[in-house]
């Protein structure tokens, strides 16, 4: 038997760090996507307010196994 996976893109955010943005994105995605198998960071970026970093953002590709 072979397995089939699906990929979706999500954006995780945090006011603290890129690492927390990844964790926040995966935590939220896991509420609706079961059996997340892997992730890939596609892009890192941030928002600036009043000359200071106000938000860290990461675009993630998330892969999960399709139910049988």
Segments and roles (model prediction):
Residues 45-68:
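A cross-kingdom feature marking charged/low-complexity
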Residues 11, 42, 63:
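Residues in well-ordered beta-strands of folded domains
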Residues 2-38:
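Short, well-ordered alpha-helical segments
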